[in-house]
Swiss-Prot record:
Family the UniProt entry places it in: Belongs to the HypA/HybF family.
PANTHER family the UniProt entry points to: HYDROGENASE MATURATION FACTOR HYPA
Lineage of origin: Bacteria, Bacillati, Cyanobacteriota, Cyanophyceae, Oscillatoriophycideae
Name of this chain's protein: Hydrogenase maturation factor HypA
A Pfam family that the UniProt record links to this protein: HypA
Keyword Metal-binding listed: yes
Gene name as annotated: hypA
Organism: Crocosphaera subtropica (strain ATCC 51142 / BH68) (Cyanothece sp. (strain ATCC 51142))
């Protein structure tokens, strides 16, 4: 389960960027072609956040659709797996242009007024 290592890195990045501030919500963007299971990330996130400043933080996951672009005719198609066939010219030569991403999209941080 490579999601544990990925989640440990996500937690480390969020803690570093928060600089001690109270984080309320973390939003991740995970592509459907990334071979990363969102539910496994969610499970690992809860475990990795235990006994840290992130314990109890809300995790939101946005899954992005897979898209490919045909190398022959330039047509864009939806992909549910990292390969496919152009529905315009029947070519199998596609470049994946969306759906492999994993990024921390947003962090909601509570600012303290002093």
């Amino acid at each position: 389960m490579h999601e544990l290592g990925i989640t440990q890195n996500i937690v480390a990045i969020v803690l570093e960027q928060a600089r001690g501030a109270s984080v309320k919500r973390v939003t991740l963007e995970i592509g459907k072609l990334s071979a990363i299971m969102p539910e496994a990330i969610r499970f690992c996130f809860d475990i990795c956040c235990q006994d840290t400043l992130l314990e109890g933080v809300t995790l939101e996951i946005i899954e992005t659709e897979g898209k490919g672009k045909c190398r022959h005719c330039g047509h864009e198609i939806r992909l549910s797996q990292p390969f496919g066939q152009c529905d315009r010219c029947d070519s199998f030569e596609l470049d994946i242009i969306q759906g492999q991403e994993l990024q921390i999209k947003e962090m909601e941080v509570e600012e303290l007024c002093v």
